[in-house]
Amino acid sequence: MDGSGEQLGSGGPTSSEQIMKTGAFLLQGFIQDRAGRMAGETPELTLEQPPQDASTKKLSECLRRIGDELDSNMELQRMIADVDTDSPREVFFRVAADMFADGNFNWGRVVALFYFASKLVLKALCTKVPELIRTIMGWTLDFLRERLLVWIQDQGGWEGLLSYFGTPTWQTVTIFVAGVLTASLTIWKKMG
């Protein structure tokens, strides 16, 4: 490791390049999975062919389980449905910033960011604004790069997600994620 927190070379699990690449694959897969379940269609989002290694599959499955739990939170679904998407960029960045405003970073909040992005993509699909899908993914990855990258590196890369949610209490954490997202949406609605 050099002094910046990055591993020397570009291939390590905590390198900026690898974290962003894995994050893009996970976000793409998460959004395609959610869209396929909700809209019956899978948007064409392929940036590159996602890796088929066991680690990425485990991470994707972990995200899928959490997404399924969040889908069953009716209060959260109602609040997301009420979000005005006339200015989606402003909505996305305000909610994303509110999620991390207290300076506390954890995997639950990272997953909440992915979940919120997937819900905005589903709204774009429903309103037939497909060009917005790649834009939302870009915003999410920009936010990840600018605000979360160093924290993810400090957690050992994306593998930290598995240890965080790999415990039997992941359902409890899912409730926490829903709470963070609900609180962020509430703050945004009061300010907006």
Swiss-Prot record:
<dbReference type="GO" id="GO:0016020">
    <property type="term" value="C:membrane"/>
</dbReference>
<protein>
    <recommendedName>
        <fullName>Apoptosis regulator BAX</fullName>
    </recommendedName>
</protein>
<dbReference type="GO" id="GO:0042475">
    <property type="term" value="P:odontogenesis of dentin-containing tooth"/>
</dbReference>
<dbReference type="GO" id="GO:0072332">
    <property type="term" value="P:intrinsic apoptotic signaling pathway by p53 class mediator"/>
</dbReference>
<dbReference type="GO" id="GO:0010212">
    <property type="term" value="P:response to ionizing radiation"/>
</dbReference>
<dbReference type="GO" id="GO:0008283">
    <property type="term" value="P:cell population proliferation"/>
</dbReference>
<dbReference type="GO" id="GO:0030544">
    <property type="term" value="F:Hsp70 protein binding"/>
</dbReference>
<dbReference type="GO" id="GO:0060402">
    <property type="term" value="P:calcium ion transport into cytosol"/>
</dbReference>
<dbReference type="InterPro" id="IPR046371">
    <property type="entry name" value="Bcl-2_BH1-3"/>
</dbReference>
<dbReference type="GO" id="GO:0005635">
    <property type="term" value="C:nuclear envelope"/>
</dbReference>
<dbReference type="GO" id="GO:0010248">
    <property type="term" value="P:establishment or maintenance of transmembrane electrochemical gradient"/>
</dbReference>
<dbReference type="GO" id="GO:0010524">
    <property type="term" value="P:positive regulation of calcium ion transport into cytosol"/>
</dbReference>
<dbReference type="GO" id="GO:0048597">
    <property type="term" value="P:post-embryonic camera-type eye morphogenesis"/>
</dbReference>
<dbReference type="GO" id="GO:0005739">
    <property type="term" value="C:mitochondrion"/>
</dbReference>
<feature type="short sequence motif" description="BH3">
    <location>
        <begin position="59"/>
        <end position="73"/>
    </location>
</feature>
<keyword id="KW-0472">Membrane</keyword>
<dbReference type="GO" id="GO:0051649">
    <property type="term" value="P:establishment of localization in cell"/>
</dbReference>
<dbReference type="GO" id="GO:0048678">
    <property type="term" value="P:response to axon injury"/>
</dbReference>
<dbReference type="GO" id="GO:0001776">
    <property type="term" value="P:leukocyte homeostasis"/>
</dbReference>
<comment type="similarity">
    <text>Belongs to the Bcl-2 family.</text>
</comment>
<dbReference type="GO" id="GO:0009791">
    <property type="term" value="P:post-embryonic development"/>
</dbReference>
<dbReference type="GO" id="GO:0001782">
    <property type="term" value="P:B cell homeostasis"/>
</dbReference>
<dbReference type="GO" id="GO:0043525">
    <property type="term" value="P:positive regulation of neuron apoptotic process"/>
</dbReference>
<dbReference type="GO" id="GO:0015267">
    <property type="term" value="F:channel activity"/>
</dbReference>
<keyword id="KW-0053">Apoptosis</keyword>
<feature type="transmembrane region" description="Helical">
    <location>
        <begin position="172"/>
        <end position="192"/>
    </location>
</feature>
<dbReference type="GO" id="GO:0007399">
    <property type="term" value="P:nervous system development"/>
</dbReference>
<dbReference type="GO" id="GO:0060068">
    <property type="term" value="P:vagina development"/>
</dbReference>
<dbReference type="InterPro" id="IPR020717">
    <property type="entry name" value="Bcl2_BH1_motif_CS"/>
</dbReference>
<dbReference type="GO" id="GO:0042802">
    <property type="term" value="F:identical protein binding"/>
</dbReference>
<dbReference type="GO" id="GO:0043523">
    <property type="term" value="P:regulation of neuron apoptotic process"/>
</dbReference>
<dbReference type="GO" id="GO:1902445">
    <property type="term" value="P:regulation of mitochondrial membrane permeability involved in programmed necrotic cell death"/>
</dbReference>
<dbReference type="GO" id="GO:0008053">
    <property type="term" value="P:mitochondrial fusion"/>
</dbReference>
<dbReference type="GO" id="GO:0097194">
    <property type="term" value="P:execution phase of apoptosis"/>
</dbReference>
<keyword id="KW-1000">Mitochondrion outer membrane</keyword>
<comment type="subunit">
    <text>Homodimer. Forms higher oligomers under stress conditions. Forms heterooligomers with BAK. Interacts with BCL2L11. Interaction with BCL2L11 promotes BAX oligomerization and association with mitochondrial membranes, with subsequent release of cytochrome c. Forms heterodimers with BCL2. Forms heterodimers with BCL2L1 isoform Bcl-X(L), BCL2L2, MCL1 and A1. Interacts with SH3GLB1. Interacts with SFN and YWHAZ; the interaction occurs in the cytoplasm. Under stress conditions, JNK-mediated phosphorylation of SFN and YWHAZ, releases BAX to mitochondria.</text>
</comment>
<dbReference type="GO" id="GO:0006974">
    <property type="term" value="P:DNA damage response"/>
</dbReference>
<dbReference type="GO" id="GO:0009651">
    <property type="term" value="P:response to salt stress"/>
</dbReference>
<keyword id="KW-0832">Ubl conjugation</keyword>
<dbReference type="GO" id="GO:1902110">
    <property type="term" value="P:positive regulation of mitochondrial membrane permeability involved in apoptotic process"/>
</dbReference>
<dbReference type="GO" id="GO:0060011">
    <property type="term" value="P:Sertoli cell proliferation"/>
</dbReference>
<dbReference type="GO" id="GO:0060041">
    <property type="term" value="P:retina development in camera-type eye"/>
</dbReference>
